[in-house]
Each structure stands twice: as structure tokens, then as C-alpha cells.
Curated annotation (Swiss-Prot):
Domain of life, source organism: Eukaryota
Entry protein name: Protein limb expression 1 homolog
Family: Belongs to the LIX1 family.
InterPro entries registered for this protein in UniProt: Autophagy-related_EPG5, LIX1
Organism per entry: Mus musculus
């Protein structure tokens, strides 16, 4: 623990040289510190675009408690975990959670290395009650995770978050299973989706999947949305990374909106990501 704290102080001294490491998390100006931290990273590595480095979102509310989310470069999302009586307080609290995670992300243990991959795969095998042989089988979820980690060697876990979230969503809405049935390999799926960001286009495509599910099983959308809202709130109050839960909520809400506003939301669009394009390899 002492070694971790010392590493954090060193990271703060490097990334925020004008700040006192002992006072960083007590400073009310944590919003500007978070921005300063990621601007410093961009200057050092030129990893992310300068547009929208750190994005905040306040949830509509007529009164307290207020909820605020902050999305970081690379796709990770955090929210305020305390009960906040003002929007400004919620924004500061979300920024504090994001800053703590951003600093921890700089620790050597958070970078994807061979040792990190080995430990992560072992944890995945244990959680799925599988075997280590699954890690070498790209048709399994553990094998796909192993392949994704190896494809992102050298990145930190926050930099890897967006791709990870995309595949969590594809698994959740059944797309991975559908692709497996069309004989698309997981490597092809990973290579294909690595080209895309999780944007409105991808959300619209996934919302269409859920509209089809609603037609087959009326009521499933509302059921999934209630579950997603509960998961999001629970994870936020625990100070956890939120992107997967938040995207589920956004996609399901979009699907419900389209059902009530568009008489034929299943009409294909040139803007939608096409699984046919992916499976056209075969």
C-alpha cells in the first residue's frame, strides 16, 4: 500500500507539477485538475484528439439529489457517488472519482503487459468456470478477451475501455452469438469493430436490434431498461466505471423513443453499421 501511495505521489508530481500531491483530492477545483491532467497526457503522447477531452453530462432533475457523469478520453465513464445537493457539487464529485481513477490508471499494474494479460485471463477463466484452454480458443468469450488484450498490448485499461464496452454491448444484445452463427470468427469481429467508436450511429444500430426483440417479446425493452437503470445507479454509488451500464440505458431509451415516434423504425439506413459487411468476408 505504501508503495502504491508513493507511486501515486510520483505520478501527480509528473502530471500536475504545480499541485501539492497531499492536497489534490481536497482541492475544490478538481474539475480543472482533471482537465489539466488529460491535457498533460495529450501533450506527452498525442494519444487523444484535443476536442472534448473530458465531457460532462448532468442528468435532468428538478431538485436534489443531482447526478453528473464525466466521460474520459478512451471511453471510461464515472459519476458522483455521494448525495449531492447542487449540480456543481455533483460535477465536482464525479470529477474527483474520475481523477482518482485516472491517476491509478498510470500505475504500471494498469498497463496491458504479458503479465497483466496472464493474470486477467486467469481471473476470466475463474469467473466463467472454464479452463485455461479456453484462452487459446477464439470461439470462447475468454479467448476473445485474450485476443483483445493482446491486440492492445502497451495500452492502459482506460485507453482500452471503449473497445471493451463495445464487445460487452455486442454480447449483451446477442450480436456476438448471431455473428458466430454466420461463421464470422471473433478475430474478424474484433478487427471490424476496432475501426469504430461508440457513437450515435452504433447506438442507433443496437437500438434497432432491441426494437426487433420488443416485437418478438413485448415488454422486454421496459424490463431491460429498469434493470439497466438499477445497475447504473448501484455502480455509480459504488464509484465504479459506468460506461457499459450507461450505454445500455442510452440504447434502450433510444429504442423506446423510436418505437413511439417512428411507425416503421426497422427500415434499414445507409448510416447504420452493417453486419452484412462484416460477414461478407465469407
Amino acid at each position: 500500500m505504501d508503495r502504491t501511495l508513493e507511486s501515486l505521489r510520483h505520478i501527480i508530481a509528473q502530471a500536475l507539477p504545480h499541485r501539492d500531491p497531499a492536497l489534490v483530492f481536497k482541492d475544490l477545483n478538481v474539475v480543472s485538475m482533471l482537465q489539466e491532467f488529460w491535457e498533460s497526457k495529450q501533450q506527452q503522447k498525442a494519444t487523444f484528439s484535443s476536442e472534448g477531452l473530458v465531457v460532462y453530462e448532468s442528468m435532468p432533475s428538478s431538485g436534489p439529489p443531482f447526478v453528473s457523469y464525466v466521460t474520459l478520453p478512451g471511453g471510461s465513464c464515472f459519476g458522483n457517488f455521494q448525495c449531492c445537493l447542487s449540480r456543481a457539487e455533483a460535477r465536482r464529485d464525479a470529477a474527483k472519482v474520475a481523477l482518482i481513477n485516472s491517476l491509478f490508471n498510470e500505475l504500471p499494474s494498469r498497463r496491458i503487459t504479458k503479465e497483466f494479460i496472464m493474470e486477467s485471463v486467469q481471473e476470466a477463466v475463474a469467473s466463467t468456470r472454464g479452463t485455461l484452454d479456453d484462452a487459446d480458443d477464439p470461439s470462447t468469450s475468454v479467448g476473445a478477451y485474450h485476443y483483445m488484450l493482446e491486440s492492445n498490448m502497451g495500452k492502459t485499461m482506460l485507453e482500452f475501455q471503449e473497445l471493451m464496452t463495445i464487445f460487452q454491448l455486442l454480447h449483451w444484445n446477442g450480436s456476438l452469438k448471431a455473428l458466430r452463427e454466420t461463421k464470422c470468427s471473433r478475430q474478424e469481429v474484433i478487427s471490424y469493430y476496432s475501426q469504430y467508436s461508440l457513437d450515435e450511429k452504433m447506438r442507433s444500430h443496437m437500438a434497432l436490434d432491441w426494437i426487433m426483440k420488443e416485437r418478438e417479446s413485448p415488454g422486454i425493452l421496459s424490463q431491460e431498461l429498469r434493470a439497466a437503470l438499477g445497475q447504473l445507479e448501484e455502480a455509480r454509488k459504488a464509484g465504479q466505471e459506468l460506461r457499459f451500464y450507461k450505454e445500455k440505458k442510452e440504447i434502450l431509451s433510444l429504442a423506446l423513443t423510436q418505437i413511439y415516434s417512428d411507425p416503421d423504425p426497422s427500415s434499414p439506413s445507409d448510416d447504420q453499421l452493417s453486419l452484412t459487411a462484416l460477414c461478407g468476408y465469407h
